[in-house]
């Protein structure tokens, strides 16, 4: 992240103020203040980690993935008890994305659920949509299979199994 000395001074002052306003995180803000003041470029890269960008297409893909899970959950609810017993109920839970490798996706899902109020039925679990393993490729395969289903919101037990194993 390229910053002028004036920008570094402003950011340093902001970190100083934050350390005073939030004593519980003062050590974190003092560390960041030191990094900015001294210009440690390797560590300054971590300041940039939260300033990502998701394109409109990437946002729509995430919404499509979440909508697919919504459709699978609703379809499961419409199955009779015998069919429902054949569906692995754990696989119906939307796990989210891997915070280590798919951080922007995790943050977008959290934004959609927490700020926008979408998909309130999704269980945040203990990890708040951090699957702790890369999921995007798996979701893309599942999405392809789901899109090929003739009735995407009235899936049968067999179609659910096909989507799970995509």
From Swiss-Prot:
InterPro entries, per the entry: UPF0304_YfbU (IPR005587), YfbU_alpha-helical_sf (IPR023146), YfbU_helix-hairpin_sf (IPR023145)
Domain of life: Bacteria
HAMAP family xrefs: UPF0304 (MF_00762)
Similarity remark: Belongs to the UPF0304 family.
Name of the protein in its database record: UPF0304 protein VP0990
Organism of this sequence: Vibrio parahaemolyticus serotype O3:K6 (strain RIMD 2210633)
């Amino acid at each position: 992240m390229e910053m002028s000395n004036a920008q570094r001074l402003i950011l340093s002052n902001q970190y100083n103020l934050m350390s005073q306003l939030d004593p519980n995180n003062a050590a974190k803000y003092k560390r960041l203040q030191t990094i900015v003041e001294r210009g440690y470029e390797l560590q300054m890269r971590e300041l940039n980690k939260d300033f990502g960008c998701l394109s409109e297409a990437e946002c729509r893909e995430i919404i499509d993935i979440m909508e697919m899970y919504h459709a699978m959950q609703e379809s499961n609810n419409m199955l009779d008890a015998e069919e429902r017993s054949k569906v692995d109920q754990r696989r119906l839970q939307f796990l989210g994305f891997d915070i280590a490798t798919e951080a922007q996706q995790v943050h977008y899902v959290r934004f959609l659920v927490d700020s926008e109020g979408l998909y309130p039925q999704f269980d945040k679990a203990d990890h708040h949509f951090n699957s702790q393993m890369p999921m995007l490729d798996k979701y893309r395969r599942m999405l392809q299979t789901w899109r090929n289903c003739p009735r995407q919101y009235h899936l049968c037990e067999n179609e659910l199994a096909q989507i799970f194993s995509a």
